Design a protein with these regions (language model features):
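Active-site glycine-rich loops that stabilize anionic/oxyanionic intermediates
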Residues: 16-19, 89, 211
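Conserved alpha/beta-hydrolase "acid-adjacent" motif
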Residues: 214-223
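Catalytic active-site module of serine/aspartate enzymes centered on a nucleophile-bearing elbow/loop
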Residues: 231-282
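Conserved acidic catalytic loop of the alpha/beta-hydrolase fold
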Residues: 66-83
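Gly/Ala-rich beta-loop-alpha elbow adjacent to hydrolase catalytic centers
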Residues: 86-91, 95
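Conserved alpha/beta-hydrolase
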Residues: 32-54
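Flexible "cap/lid" loop of the alpha/beta hydrolase fold
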Residues: 104-139, 180-187
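Short beta-strand/loop motif that positions the catalytic acidic residue
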Residues: 201, 207-209, 213
Length: 282
């Protein structure tokens, strides 16, 4: 397992839709035990308990992709060294947008929502987001995420009892506007999810997937990774058999967590940036 070096000693973990920073609790403990400083900043205004967000989801409804990216940009530029950036699901999309801004020593998209340009939209992805997409008015709402929704989207490889307990601990309503931004990016000429996939001066990128993922099926994740093949910068892809979208708590999560960290440490040490990027924001 990789350990901190003089070049990289911090990992920034970015949660996705339907989740908060609490979803990283197991990864934080595992990475911290290896000597890393692990940061799990929430989306803007969402740095409160799951229970409070369920009672008052106003901060969720206000989310916009551009604002989320600006929020993490400020955090990362304030660090003394470029960190490893990892994001899950829509957090993986945010990680790719940060990569496009020249940030990070290495970036990992864990079952990431795709950037603009990926044309594939699998039926299971649509089903996972149906509670949001079925009503255009949800674009301006925080949309509830039920136990049944969680079972299909996150708990499809675990028992109903464990899925329900995980829903109780982790799940929050989804930011409808963010989901609509991602789902219809290819129809929006000014989409906030657009990146320059051909740039070669970026940090290394790893995209991971799970063979049983309903939200971001492996076919969608691999299509996202393939967009970057026109760049000479490092782009890697890894699919984990039997894994769902629940990377934070599915039994065996340690395998993906360890692989992601090992890959990122090695890639970051080879990339070896010396300062946090001051590249202009897109």
């Amino acid at each position: 397992m990789g350990v901190p070096t003089g070049r990289v000693d911090t990992v920034v973990l970015i949660h996705g839709l339907w989740m908060t920073s609490r979803s990283w609790e197991h990864w934080v403990d595992r990475y911290a035990a290896r000597g890393f400083r692990v940061l799990t900043p929430a989306w803007p205004g969402m740095d409160v308990d799951v229970e409070r967000l369920r009672e008052d989801p106003t901060p969720i409804a206000a989310q916009r992709i551009a604002g989320i990216v600006d929020h993490y940009t400020a955090i990362i530029r304030g660090l003394p060294r470029p960190p490893i950036i990892m994001g899950h699901s829509f957090g993986g999309l945010i990680a790719q947008l940060l990569l496009d801004r020249g940030l990070g020593a290495a970036v990992v998209g864990l079952h990431p929502a795709p950037v603009k340009g990926v044309l594939k939209l699998p039926l299971s992805t649509l089903r996972s987001g149906f509670a949001i997409l079925r009503n255009p008015a949800n674009r301006h709402r925080a949309v509830p995420f039920t136990r049944e929704d969680f079972r299909y989207s996150f708990g499809n490889t675990i028992s109903p009892e464990y899925s329900d307990a995980s829903w109780e601990r982790y799940a929050v309503p989804a930011a409808g506007h963010v989901f609509f931004e991602g789902a219809f990016a290819n129809l929006d000429p000014t989409s906030a999810t657009a990146v320059n996939t051909k740039r070669s001066d970026r940090a290394p990128l790893l995209v991971t997937a799970g063979s049983e993922d309903h939200v971001v099926p492996a076919s969608l994740a691999s299509s996202c990774a393939n967009l970057y093949r026109g760049s000479t910068a490092v782009t890697s892809y890894r699919e984990f058999p039997g894994r769902s979208h629940f990377v934070g708590g599915e039994p065996g999560w340690e395998e993906e967590a360890d692989f992601a960290l090992e890959w990122a440490v090695e890639a970051a040490n080879e990339y070896s940036p010396t300062v946090v990027s001051t590249a202009p924001r897109r």
